[in-house]
UniProtKB/Swiss-Prot annotation:
Species assigned in the record: Escherichia coli O17:K52:H18 (strain UMN026 / ExPEC)
One Gene Ontology biological process: methionyl-tRNA aminoacylation
Cofactor stoichiometry and binding remark: Binds 1 zinc ion per subunit.
PANTHER family for the chain: METHIONINE--TRNA LIGASE, METHIONINE--TRNA LIGASE, CYTOPLASMIC
UniProt key word Disulfide bond: no
Name of the protein this chain belongs to: Methionine--tRNA ligase
Keywords: Aminoacyl-tRNA synthetase, ATP-binding, Cytoplasm, Ligase, Metal-binding, Nucleotide-binding, Protein biosynthesis, RNA-binding, tRNA-binding, Zinc
SUPFAM superfamilies in the cross-refs: Anticodon-binding domain of a subclass of class I aminoacyl-tRNA synthetases (SSF47323), Methionyl-tRNA synthetase (MetRS), Zn-domain (SSF57770), Nucleic acid-binding proteins (SSF50249), Nucleotidylyl transferase (SSF52374)
Main localization of the protein described in the UniProt heading: cytoplasm
Function: Is required not only for elongation of protein synthesis but also for the initiation of all mRNA translation through initiator tRNA(fMet) aminoacylation.
Entry's Gene Ontology cellular component terms: cytosol
Length: 677
């Protein structure tokens, strides 16, 4: 059946430009690339684009930490990201940046249209402000306890445990991620996108049946809890685009980040000198298809804010969102200490890209399920499937064809019915690729590979080769095996681009989806060269060890107090619980005759007096100034006999020593005898 060629625009979520690409990122880019390559094989016009997400406070602060400009940092990171994606043969037509003139113009255009249409609201809000750093704190730079499920250590915009979204001011016991200080509240005028105005449209889009069931169900929960206006502005200092006619106010990174899809495509059109495609793909009534491959952690932004922004600014909405789960390694979250937090570049130093592309593909489905990269299973599956079943099929037949028949295949098929079984599978396998049921496609292909190898085993060309007068049979059997290999590699072409190149060189023909309907008859193949090498666990061990070493090398050198006075060995809670810390009032403080380091302190523990010798004289040359001050002491320390008398405890102080000793004091209201817990 002839397919009508479609116009398709495909995007992956934009990697953030403050860190390297790792194997978790690669799941999405591989999934999208396999789907895109299949669409291209079927004759569709596909534009596959991405960009770096290059704005926000994290980038600003990291650049400061590195002593370079944000522009320099994101430029270097973009080159690294593009090198990694090229190494994994991700076939992007364009890779751009949100820090671009195209993105600035489109962000301002969408904002102005939303404002003209009454969807931008101004109001003064109270924000968390870091008093130590002198800056308002973005959502991701505040952590605290989730106000909904009470999970600790959650960011200021959404909870990674229950998925709830909220304002940073709703966090329980918030702390600044930048300085560790407790934020204070300050007022600031902000701009809000009126998301609730689009509730009806979004619910209709949800019910259209296009979205994954899990996404639609999650969206329904959000509708039931009520949509809120969305804060789209941030205060200076901020690295991003300044909002027109609003000095000191910047677009929130999540406003201009998805617009980066449009910016990258506009950049591609401009490079091509194409003045019509941008409008053709993005206009309100566009018939082109638009798909976003994203992770489950950013569904909220892509399923609510993004389509509403597009609707409100008179652009088309996505055709669908293709959402995937996370990657675990060996059944657990990726870990730097275990060496399973693996960068894309590190992987390519130890394995080829096709191996990971195959393993991920074999495990992917259209559902939002997490994928486990079990490294032992990875080795076994790559060897069993790619090497033993597919590549071996070619190698065990090619030798006879090259040596005995000068590389020329038979003029007729030895088993036309078996070949038809292989080509008839194109519909089922194609539908699996189309619907992103990648694991099913691989299972179907490997079942065919088993059939092909069974055929060769039964025909035993190595036996036939020794029998006189059976040259025609030998040529027919081996030609059949090579033709079946060709069909298998055609089905696997979206997954294994580098192996496909080598297979095409051997077969002396391009692999096309429609081409398999005609077998290679009387066709000359090239001399066979090894197509793929087996892998082993030693490579895995080297990969893990290299990842550990990279973490050590990348560790930020410790500076300041920790460099001179490292944190001591970890103790248990039971050990700590033995220490009884109490608030004490300094009733008297005096020099100790015969010592140039000690002060004698008389402490009131709320009904009990203690005599303590403390080596703080260098920092407190006037002991009388300490009288009447509250401090903290270790109350259950065994008395220590000294030359000057008995010391009945220890007062708590911080600092490196000398003049830099700082006696600790409790907050106002604490009374002598209060226990420190």
């Amino acid at each position: 059946m002839t397919q009508v060629a479609k116009k398709i625009l495909v995007t992956c979520a934009l990697p953030y430009a403050n860190g390297s690409i790792h194997l978790g990122h690669m799941l999405e880019h591989i999934q999208a690339d396999v789907w895109v390559r299949y669409q291209r094989m079927r004759g569709h016009e596909v534009n596959f684009i991405c960009a770096d997400d290059a704005h926000g406070t994290p980038i600003m602060l990291k650049a400061q930490q590195l002593g370079i400009t944000p522009e320099q940092m994101i430029g270097e990171m973009s080159q690294e990201h593009q090198t990694d994606f090229a190494g994994f043969n991700i076939s992007y037509d364009n890779y751009h940046s949100t820090h671009s003139e195209e993105n600035r113009q489109l962000s301002e255009l969408i904002y102005s249209r939303l404002k003209e249409n009454g969807f931008i609201k101004n109001r003064t809000i109270s924000q968390l402000y870091d008093p130590e750093k002198g800056m308002f704190l973005p959502d991701r730079f505040v952590k605290g306890t989730c106000p909904k499920c009470k999970s600790p250590d959650q960011y200021g915009d959404n909870c990674e445990v229950c998925g709830a979204t909220y304002s940073p001011t709703e966090l329980i016991e918030p702390k600044s991620v930048v300085s560790g200080a407790t934020p204070v509240m300050r007022d600031s005028e902000h701009f809000f996108f009126d998301l609730p105005s689009f509730s009806e449209m979004l619910q209709a889009w949800t019910r259209s049946g296009a979205l994954q069931e899990q996404v639609a169900n999650k969206m329904q929960e959000w509708f039931e809890s009520g949509l809120q206006q969305w804060d789209i502005s941030r205060d200076a200092p901020y690295f991003g685009f300044e909002i027109p006619n609003a000095p000191g106010k910047y677009f929130y990174v999540w406003l201009d980040a998805p617009i980066g899809y449009m910016g990258s495509f506009k950049n591609l059109c401009d490079k091509r000198g194409d003045t019509t495609s941008f409008d053709e793909y993005w206009k309100k009534d566009s018939t082109a298809e638009l798909y976003h491959f994203i992770g489950k952690d950013i569904v909220y932004f892509h399923s609510l804010f993004w389509p509403a922004m597009l609707e409100g600014s008179n652009f088309r909405k996505p055709t669908n969102l293709f959402v995937h789960g996370y990657v675990t390694v060996n059944g657990a979250k990726m870990s730097k200490s275990r060496g399973t937090f693996i960068k894309a570049s590190t992987w390519l130093n130890h394995f080829d890209a096709d191996s990971l592309r195959y393993y991920y593909t074999a495990k992917l489905s259209s559902r939002i399920d997490d994928i486990d990269l079990n490294l032992e299973d990875f080795v076994q599956r790559v060897n069993a499937d790619i090497v033993n079943k597919v590549v071996n099929l070619a190698s065990r037949n090619a030798g006879f064809i090259n040596k005995r028949f000068d590389g020329v295949l038979a003029s007729e098929l030895a088993d036309p019915q078996l070949y038809k079984t292989f080509t008839d599978a194109a519909e089922v396998i194609g539908e699996a690729w189309e619907s992103r049921e990648f694991g099913k496609a691989i299972r179907e292909i490997m079942a065919l590979a088993d059939l092909a190898n069974r055929y060769v085993d039964e025909q035993a060309p190595w036996v036939v080769a020794k029998q006189e007068g059976r040259d025609a049979d030998l040529q027919a059997i081996c030609s059949m095996g090579i033709n079946l290999f060709r069909v298998l590699m055609t089905y696997l072409k979206p997954v294994l681009p580098k192996l496909t190149e080598r297979a095409e060189a051997f077969l002396n023909t391009e692999l096309t989806w429609h081409g398999i309907q005609q077998p290679l008859l009387g066709h000359k193949v090239n001399p066979f060269k090894a197509l793929y090498n087996r892998i082993d666990m030693k490579q895995v061990e080297a990969l893990v060890e290299a990842s550990k070493e990279e973490v050590k090398a990348a560790a930020t050198p410790v500076t300041g107090p920790l460099a001179d006075d490292p944190i001591q060995e970890t103790i248990t809670f039971d050990d700590f619980a033995k220490v009884d810390l109490r608030v004490a009032l300094i009733e008297n403080a005096e020099f100790v005759e015969g010592s140039d380091k000690l002060l004698r302190l008389t402490l009131d523990l709320g009904g009990e007096k203690r005599n303590v010798f403390s080596g703080i004289r260098s920092a407190y040359p006037d002991p009388q100034a300490l009288i009447g001050r509250h401090t903290i002491m270790v109350a259950n320390l065994a008395p220590r006999k000294m030359r000057f008398g008995i010391s009945e405890g220890m007062v708590m102080a911080a600092g490196p020593g000398g003049k830099d000793i700082f006696l600790l004091s409790p907050d106002a209201g604490a009374k002598p005898g209060h226990q420190v817990k």
